[in-house]
A protein has these predicted regions:
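Alpha-helix C-terminal capping segments
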Residues: 119-129, 143-155, 176-177, 274-284, ...
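Claisen-condensing/thiolase-fold acyl-transfer catalytic domains that form or cleave C-C bonds
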Residues: 264-268, 272, 364-430
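Buried hydrophobic positions in well-ordered alpha/beta secondary-structure cores of metabolic enzymes
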Residues: 82, 101, 113, 120, ...
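A short, small-residue-rich loop immediately preceding and capping a beta-strand
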Residues: 116, 127-163, 256-270, 290-291, ...
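Active-site nucleophile and cofactor-binding loops and adjacent substrate-binding regions
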Residues: 103-114, 132-141, 232, 261-266, ...
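Active-site/ligand-binding loops adjacent to catalytic centers
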Residues: 64-66, 190, 196-234, 254, ...
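Positively charged, low-complexity intrinsically disordered leader regions
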Residues: 2-129
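Active-site-proximal loop->helix
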Residues: 141-204, 300-313, 421-429
Length: 455
């Protein structure tokens, strides 16, 4: 029987709506709070930062939200994305399990980030915004937003986390090619950046600091808005096109996953593939596990505290109910820059608290080992972030073999690693250190946040 290695949908089969998990969550998340009053935020609290349509999506409990035609038209350049059966990887492992992966690296940004970048740029343009500010870790989000902003005629200012700015010069150049201005963060351009540099002149930066800088610039100009690449509900909403496509593709393959896996930074790529499958679990009783894999050096889901905390370092965002390591936390300089964030999205946090998803933490070298095996067998060089999902999938296959069972495993290959060659070079030079955050470090970080217990 001929092997079918990839399942490709036609453009006509691409979903026309995003799926909103808030419609089906048994326990809705606690509301974000105004940090000054500790009262739930209203649209007026967010209007200086986000366009109104995205604010509506942030709080919506409608199950499905239509994708605008202009967004669908750009999606068609690279969507639907392919679903692959990893036959060669299965053979290398000698596993009885079936491994599938949804590949999101085949677009202009090289990652899943394009799915929400296009949507956010569109809604900003529709409301008369002229410039957007944003942060980026490893550069995938900045690359995604750069092209989207150029397409819709918007200026873009990107604050790129310093350690990734230095590690990945190609990403900065890619953003420049698409028309964006890129500043290493922390910078002297903002009060938030200057404060960090005064305290820590050699700071490697963090996503929390970069968010603070981008928001500070945005609120100073009525024609400028801020855009976030993960964490928030509307960002996660836009990513659900991944899982909705995967549901159709798995059906075409005549299969259904026992477990769905995604790496975890703020929550967008994991939620994008997992939430449509969680819908099937919640509404139709499907037996499936949903597993996030995060760095052991930044383990907010596995070791963090469920609490109200800021989404940024300077305390400019609302207080969000989430698993957090503390908004002042500066992660270790791992090469998975997109996962170096102190907190978890509100939706994922609530679902983890309620037991609907699972979380695991992995060390850096094990994940790169899995990424190299994947590259050598499947012919795609994974992004360092995606290596965490690969490591999680390998774990599941090996565990199933030890138990004498065959599992169907699906993971999200969120992006390619073509700009991350230096990280792989360090891996082969045995110069890629592991770092596991200790309980003492976590306690110290949480003790420094100086916030009341609002739970």
């Amino acid at each position: 029987m001929e092997k079918i290695r990839k399942i490709i949908l036609s453009e006509k089969e691409m979903p026309r709506q995003w799926y909103n998990i808030q419609a089906d969550m048994p326990n809705k998340p606690l509301p974000p709070l105004n940090p000054a009053t500790h009262k739930p935020v209203g649209p007026e609290d967010l209007a200086a930062v986000f366009p109104m349509e995205l604010i509506k999506q942030e709080v919506s409990t409608e199950r499905y939200i239509d994708i605008p035609d202009e967004v669908l038209d750009l999606y068609r350049i690279f969507r639907p994305s392919p679903l692959f059966r990893a036959f060669n990887l299965e053979k290398a492992l000698g596993t009885k399990s079936k491994i599938y992966y949804k590949y999101e690296g085949g677009n202009y940004s090289g990652s899943h980030k394009a799915n929400t970048a296009i949507a956010q740029a569109y809604y900003n343009k529709e409301e008369g915004v002229r410039r957007i500010t944003t942060e980026t870790g490893a550069g995938q989000w900045g690359s995604a937003m750069s092209f989207a902003c150029h397409h819709f005629g918007l200026e873009l200012l990107v604050f790129m986390v310093r350690v990734s700015f230095d590690q990945k010069p190609g990403r900065k150049l890619m953003m420049n090619i698409y028309g964006a201005k890129v500043i290493p963060s922390p910078s002297t351009m903002t009060a938030a950046g200057r404060k960090v540099l005064e305290m820590y002149p050699d700071s490697p930066g963090s996503l929390g600091i970069a968010i603070s800088e981008a928001m500070e610039v945005a609120v100073q100009d009525p024609y400028t808005k801020y855009s976030l690449g993960s964490v928030l509900n509307h960002v996660i909403l836009h990513q659900t096109i991944i899982g909705q496509e995967a549901l159709i593709q798995m059906e075409k393959a005549g299969d259904y996953p026992d477990v769905v896996i995604g790496c975890f930074g703020g929550g967008s790529n994991f939620s994008g593939i997992a939430f449509p499958f969680l819908r099937e679990k919640l509404l139709n009783g499907k037996d499936i596990r949903l597993v996030t894999v995060e760095p052991a050096s930044c383990p907010k889901l596995t070791k963090g505290k469920f609490m109200y905390d800021f989404g940024d370092t300077a305390g400019m965002t609302p207080l969000l109910p989430m698993y957090s390591l503390g908004h002042n936390f500066i992660p270790d300089k791992i090469h998975a820059g997109g996962l170096r964030y102190h907190g978890a999205g509100v939706l994922v946090s609530q679902l983890l608290k309620d037991g609907f998803i699972e979380a695991k933490a992995k060390l850096q070298r094990e994940c790169f080992e899995g990424g190299v095996l994947f590259a050598r067998t499947e012919g795609i060089l994974p992004a360092p972030e995606s290596n965490y999902a690969i490591a999680g999938a390998l774990d599941e296959a090996r565990k199933a073999d030890l138990e004498g069972v065959s599992k169907t495993i699906l993971f999200n290959l969120s992006g390619h690693g073509h700009f991350d060659i230096s990280a792989y070079e360090k891996y082969f030079e045995n110069n890629l250190p592991d770092h596991e955050l200790s309980s003492a470090e976590i306690e110290k970080s949480l003790a420094n946040i100086n916030l009341p217990d609002l739970m």
